Every structure is written in structure tokens, then in C-alpha cells.
Amino acid sequence: MTLHRFKKIALLSALGIAAISMNVQAAERIAFIPKLVGVGFFTSGGNGAQQAGKELGVDVTYDGPTEPSVSGQVQLINNFVNQGYNAIIVSAVSPDGLCPALKRAMQRGVRVLTWDSDTKPECRSYYINQGTPAQLGGMLVDMAARQVNKDKAKVAFFYSSPTVTDQNQWVKEAKAKIAKEHPGWEIVTTQFGYNDATKSLQTAEGILKAYSDLDAIIAPDANALPAAAQAAENLKNDKVAIVGFSTPNVMRPYVERGTVKEFGLWDVVQQGKISVYVADALLKKGSMKTGDKLDIQGVGQVEVSPNSVQGYDYEADGNGIVLLPERVIFNKENIGKYDF
């Protein structure tokens, strides 16, 4: 082999290796983080995110802490940033606790989005939102009103924690709607299960024992709602209306037995899918602005809205909210159509 030919082959080999290296580096990697693992709601969202990854040809990793904590989520965020992930999508356990880590991630060029539960808007680019507080808070009250159907009633609120962003926004709107439209309803207690199945069941049983004449439990949380239903069955209380948000697969037996007449949610699989599609669009296009639309396979079209739809004052370029197209009320007639 001549020296010239050897150099040519060596150069081509080096170029080939460089091209392969560039392709590896260019492959998108997206982290999808729940509040905690082991809960059906978050698993379903992760399934939707990973389905979107397959459709788009991007690598989506689903991982979260075993308990809902700021420190657990911060550790994961930092790990994903250090591993070179291009985008992070997180369901935040706190509106501000994750902000230092997320802002550092953005400074390093990582796209940061939220889903399910938001941070302060300045700590992310876009929030993939299941519904506005007014929509979801109103949904909770309307479901309860259809069953309580009386002017004077006693109502309890029961959900995950006093600090979680999304549920507290919904409950604030729900309580305002009760004050305006059902002034005879008395909110006798607001209690928390802290995303723990055992504690949630104990808390729900405690509510029912303490307020034997309770008319409704409003439980907008994937752990609290089934816990309230199970508590009612354990205590043989068939008079209290139990409404809230959880997944159809978890709530199916309670609906079939008549313990829960109706409950609500949104398609969390779609929410996970939309989140990854939006992150992918940002990585490819660089930015999106209010009014921009995005077509999502199997879902339809979504649009970027201003942060004001969530009641925020903060607005900035490359920052906004993407609302899910619809929310669902599940009952005995339609629950069989859903599997998540």
C-alpha cells in the first residue's frame, strides 16, 4: 500500500468516526420526571411520553423519586443535566423548590418543560397543562353538586399536600365556586394524604369517622380519591358522595360497585405524549410563541397559550402553556372505553 493511499484511507476512517460521533451526540434525549414512581397516573403519563419518543425517534427516559420530594427531583434533574440530556419535562412537587436546579439546566442549554404540576413560569419554558384552575375546580364542584343536590351540605376536601401547585390551584377555585354558587355548603375540613396510599386511607377513614353526617368528599388526587372510596366501603358508608380525579383503571372497581358515581380526569397518556412532542419541536425549531400550533399524531392539534390562562402575571418570549384538548368525566356507562 502506498503512503498516499494509506493516508487517504486513514482520513476517510477518521471522517467516518467523526460522523458517527456527531450522530450520537445529535440524538435527542428527553427526561420525563413524575412526582414519584409507582403510581398508576404517573406510569400512564410515562407510557405516553415513551410512545411519543418511539414515534419521533427520540430517546425518552422515564424516572422519578420513590417519594415525592424536592430533593429527590432535584437530584434527578441534576443527574440528567450532567448526562447530557437535551430536555427535561417534570411534574413539580413544589412551585419554587425546583427553580434553582431548573434555571441552572436552562443556562446549560437544556430545554425545561413542566407537565401535570407547574413551577413558577420563569423556571420553565412551557407547561403542558391538563386544564385551567377554573376548568378543573369547576369540574370538581359540579360533580359533587349533581350528587349532593341540596342547599345545605357538609363537604370535605382531601388531596395530596398543602404545597403542591396544581391541586391547590384547583381547590382554591373550587372553594370560590362553592362560596358563590352553593353558599349553604359548609367546608368542614381540608386534609392531606401526602401521596402515600396507607396514610391516605387512614386519613380518609378519619374524615368519615369525624364527620358522620358528611355529604361529600372532594378528592382531586390519584391516591386520595381511591382511598376515600375504599374508606367508605370499609366503614359501610353509602351516603357520602365521593368525587375527584384519578385514573379509570384504579377507580373501575369502585364505579362498578356503585361506591363512586362519577369522577374526572384527562387522558394522561395523551398528556405525556403531547409533552414530548412539544419538547421535540423546541429542540428542532428553537422556540415557539403564543398562538403557534402543533400537530400531534393520534391527538390532533394543540396551541401555545399565554401564561395568563393559568392566572400568572409572568409572560416572556419562549414561555407559555399548552392546554390538553379535553377533560373527561367517567361513570359506569363510559369507563369501559378507557384503559389507563
Curated annotation (Swiss-Prot):
InterPro entries on file: Bact_Solute-Bind_Prot2, LsrB, Peripla_BP_I, SBP_2_dom
GO molecular function: carbohydrate binding
Pfam families linked to this entry: Peripla_BP_4
Subcellular location: Periplasm
Primary location group: periplasm
Gene Ontology CC entries for this record: ATP-binding cassette (ABC) transporter complex; outer membrane-bounded periplasmic space
Annotated Gene3D superfamilies: 3.40.50.2300
UniProt keyword list: Periplasm, Signal
Signal peptide: 1-26
One example of a Gene Ontology biological process annotation: transmembrane transport
Family note: Belongs to the bacterial solute-binding protein 2 family.
Subunit structure: The complex is composed of two ATP-binding proteins (LsrA), two transmembrane proteins (LsrC and LsrD) and a solute-binding protein (LsrB).
Functional note: Part of the ABC transporter complex LsrABCD involved in autoinducer 2 (AI-2) import. Binds AI-2 and delivers it to the LsrC and LsrD permeases.
The protein's name: Autoinducer 2-binding protein LsrB
Native organism taxonomy: Bacteria, Pseudomonadati, Pseudomonadota, Gammaproteobacteria, Enterobacterales
